[in-house]
A protein has these predicted regions:
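Short, solvent-exposed loop/turn segments at the edges of secondary structure
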Residues: 1, 57-59, 252
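Sparse recognition of residues in long alpha-helices and their boundaries
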Residues: 20, 48-49, 207, 255
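Elongated scaffold/linker segments in the mid-to-C-terminal portions of large proteins
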Residues: 39-203, 263-308
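Acidic/polar loop patches that form or flank catalytic/metal-binding clefts of enzymes
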Residues: 36-47, 225-228, 250
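Extended, hydrophobic/aromatic-rich amphipathic alpha-helical segments that build helical scaffolds
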Residues: 1-15, 19-34, 64, 146, ...
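C-terminal structured "cap/appendage" subdomains that terminate the fold
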Residues: 213-272
Length: 308
């Protein structure tokens, strides 16, 4: 997995023209993962939320993860940021997705006027009694119900269509009257590797194979197969968006934006905050990385990158 990521970086990040030999190494490295794991790594085809077990060894999708347990470390690994407070959730919905037992300073997770447009395009159009019941009154927009972001019937925007992510639920400890967010933190997950492979295949012009991988993740999310254009730019943007939806809170999208040279399109303030013109294509050969304070302390000759 690490080798594949390294070669995808050398294949795409340093030039707008992909290095085919490096793409081939990345693809071969990804294809070798199931065998190298003794067959223990596989794509989960049903119940998306079941992928995210507290312990990585219980999930066939996890390739490499950092151990986490509230009993021996911090009580919260920040996944509470994608969890609803209980005071936002109707009683009839409280067993549907992970919630906090008490108001611990958590914010609503909304898909509406304040939410990233990547998620908003898959928001549930109508309010539903049961987001898991395909026979309810979903109407003509049912195929836009992304099961990764379940309708919660919390009508905060007046449109009846607020959603919540259902991954990394941690554990509800009733004796403590609270939820601990202590899922093991995935570094590499098999679906992420498949999407990385799709990126490599797209760079080689193999668009049908890219669509096949997109449809794997879309089908599991309850979405219709991809039916959009298959020119390079359109498909690349769709792939970047799918990584954002599927790999939320798994630290993958940023690196994909850099490899695609599309940070400016998606995070324009990244360059604007550094005094550069985000509309100038020439600046995208340069990316500024922060230098950790601990590193600067050890080497006082280092100068912090602009903007940090």
């Amino acid at each position: 997995a690490l080798k594949a990521e390294v070669y995808m970086w050398t294949a795409r990040a340093y030039s707008t023209s992909a290095v085919v030999a490096d793409l081939d190494v990345a693809i071969a490295s990804i294809d070798a993962i199931p065998g190298a794991s003794g067959g223990s790594v596989s794509f989960v085809t049903s119940d998306w939320k079941s992928i995210f077990k507290r312990q990585a060894n219980d999930c066939p999708e996890y390739i490499w993860a950092n151990y986490f347990d509230y009993l021996v470390g911090p009580k919260n690994n920040l996944h509470d940021a994608i969890t609803l407070r209980i005071d936002n959730v109707p009683i009839e919905m409280q067993g549907t997705f992970p919630i906090a037992v008490t108001d611990e300073g958590l914010n609503r997770i909304e898909i509406g006027s304040n939410m990233n447009t990547i998620f908003r395009k898959y928001e549930t159009i109508e309010a539903h009694d049961n987001p898991f019941d395909k026979t309810d009154d979903a109407g003509p927009f049912y195929d836009k119900r992304d099961l990764r972001y379940i309708n919660s019937m919390v009508d905060t925007n007046g449109d009846g269509s607020t959603n919540v992510c259902i991954k990394f639920p941690g554990i509800l400890v009733t004796t403590d009257n609270r939820r601990y967010w202590d899922n093991d933190l995935p570094i590499y997950r098999w679906t992420g590797m498949l999407l990385l492979k799709a990126e490599a295949l797209l760079a080689k012009g193999q668009t049908s194979a890219v669509v096949d991988i997109l449809n794997m993740t879309r089908t599991r999310a309850g979405l219709a197969n991809y039916s959009g254009a298959t020119d390079f730019n359109t498909l690349e943007n769709e792939l970047l968006d799918e990584v954002a939806r599927e790999m939320l809170a798994e630290n993958q999208r940023w690196w994909g934006l850099i490899r695609a040279h599309k940070v400016g399109q998606n995070v324009p303030r990244f360059m604007a905050n550094r005094g550069d013109d985000s509309t100038d294509a020439n600046i995208w050969n340069f990316y500024y990385w922060p230098i950790a304070e601990s590193v600067k302390i050890k080497n006082d000759k280092l100068v912090q990158s602009p903007g940090y």
